Amino acid sequence: MSFLKTTTVVVTLTAGLLLSTVAQAHPKLLSSTPAEGSDAAAPSKIELHFSENLTTQFSGAKLIMTDMPGMPNSPMGVKAGVSGGGDPKTMVITPTSPLTTGTYKVEWRAVSSDTHPITGNFSFKVK
């Protein structure tokens, strides 16, 4: 094979690998406030920071109280609004009422430009 043909094959294969990697990229949760597993005062909002810009109309989250002192019932949903943050890589959950002492779980769904939904969850405690 000539040098030119070999170079063309190598460049084509490299470009194909790079494009397939970009096409398969999905948003990843990089951090949250409060952080996963944290034990802190009640936050007025919960921020989720992702690795990619989110498509807000297809992304969302639920806030669930999973445990509290004297809680005899099953986990219960907490009313909260979900919106994009000032940064397109941020999702903000704002409870409609102050959070009380207990354990909370955030279940999130993130969709970026590749349109594949990625889901996850994390928990934190409120003192």
Where are these regions (language model features)?
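Bacterial N-terminal signal peptides that target proteins for export
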Residues: 1-11
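N-terminal non-catalytic regions of secreted/periplasmic and cell-surface proteins
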Residues: 24-62
